[in-house]
Amino acid sequence: MSVNEKYELRGINHLALVCADMQRTIDFYSGVLGMPLIKTIELPNDMGQHFFFDCGNGDTIAFFWLVDAPDGVPGISAPAGLPGEEELNSATGSMNHVAFAVPPEKFDEYYAKFKEEGIKVSFVLNHDDSPMGVTRHPHDGTFVRSFYFQDPDGALLEFACWTKTFTEADVVHEPRTAADRKVPVAR
């Protein structure tokens, strides 16, 4: 296992997203996903609110409700929809999605539960090193299993479970640079 020799980082303290309706956000994250609301803050000068939810293992996901936040733009500020159905692109500097770790032994149960509750979910993706990067069925080369869904504001969320431990052999690709990008031209 790799160790950070420079800083003693202990994971993600929180991710902060922006919502349009804090009550709807509470209803989804606490009501649908079962995450306890653990801290609420009123921002100064009537700027808005900042609420935190416990998403397990001491990690939190937070939301700003800002009185003057612009509306999100699907495909720019976040992906337009679920993987396999819509474009997965989002703008440079944006958050593409949040993946919550779930126990591998409960993954299929959770997927079925989402479907039973009528939550729109992607098909299960079994991520691997094949040319397409995913398969419909798990196999020995699968390194993570996941499914995707969206919150009420369109943020792309994922339930994921690791299925193997990585080694140095898993780091094989040369990093791309800004020069490799194909930036769309505005009309």
What annotation goes with each model-predicted range?
Residues 43-44, 127-129, 163:
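Conserved beta-strand edge residues that scaffold enzyme active sites
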Residues 155:
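Conserved Rossmann-like nucleotide-cofactor binding loop
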Residues 18-71:
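Core segments of cupin and vicinal oxygen chelate
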Residues 72-75, 164-178:
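A short, polar/charged loop-to-alpha-helix boundary motif
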Residues 1-7:
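A detector for short, charged/polar N-terminal pre-domain segments
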Residues 10, 22-23, 80-152, 175-187:
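Vicinal oxygen chelate
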Residues 54-59, 74-83, 89:
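Active-site-adjacent scaffolding segments
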